Amino acid sequence: MRQRTIVCPLIQNDGCYLLCKMADNRGVFPGQWALSGGGVEPGERIEEALRREIREELGEQLILSDITPWTFRDDIRVKTYADGRQEEIYMIYLIFDCISANRDICINDEFQDYAWVKPEELALYDLNVATRHTLALKGLL
């Protein structure tokens, strides 16, 4: 089984948290709301990976004014690729508290939508199990 280290930002701006709705045909949690993030590449430093993933998934315009390592967890997930293939992966999640200076988002094709959500409205979204766990650990659910 392949192992991946995943960097995952919990991005907050003016009291709201950024959620991204995964594409219906790919990813670990197709069609569900999630935090952004992705895998660390070989030789890449952790914060470099976090900033790269944010640029790739959310665009160049989003500015993070603060990044703080927060927690980690692991689990085994099945990832679905755009061509329909599936793979079981051991995932280590490194989760960061992030504050953004703006809300300028341009999502890539991994997502179909995004939303800035007030804490009291987070439970109204179809959150994937990993995001639900993270938000509960933070005291937001």
Swiss-Prot record:
Span of domain Nudix hydrolase: 1-141
Signal peptide: none
EC number: 3.6.1.9, 3.6.1.12, 3.6.1.-, 3.6.1.23
GO molecular function: dCTP diphosphatase activity; dTTP diphosphatase activity; dUTP diphosphatase activity; magnesium ion binding
Catalytic EC class: hydrolase
Catalytic activity: a ribonucleoside 5'-triphosphate + H2O = a ribonucleoside 5'-phosphate + diphosphate + H(+); a 2'-deoxyribonucleoside 5'-triphosphate + H2O = a 2'-deoxyribonucleoside 5'-phosphate + diphosphate + H(+); dUTP + H2O = dUMP + diphosphate + H(+); dTTP + H2O = dTMP + diphosphate + H(+)
Keywords: Hydrolase, Magnesium
Cofactor(s) essential for the protein: Mg(2+)
UniProt short sequence motif Nudix box, positions renumbered to this chain: 38-59
HAMAP family per UniProt: Nudix_NudI
Function: Catalyzes the hydrolysis of nucleoside triphosphates, with a preference for pyrimidine deoxynucleoside triphosphates (dUTP, dTTP and dCTP).
Protein family per UniProt: Belongs to the Nudix hydrolase family. NudI subfamily.
Subunit comment: Monomer.
NCBIfam families: PRK15472.1 (NF012016)
Name of the protein described by the UniProt record: Nucleoside triphosphatase NudI
Organism: Salmonella choleraesuis (strain SC-B67)
Lineage: Bacteria, Pseudomonadati, Pseudomonadota, Gammaproteobacteria, Enterobacterales
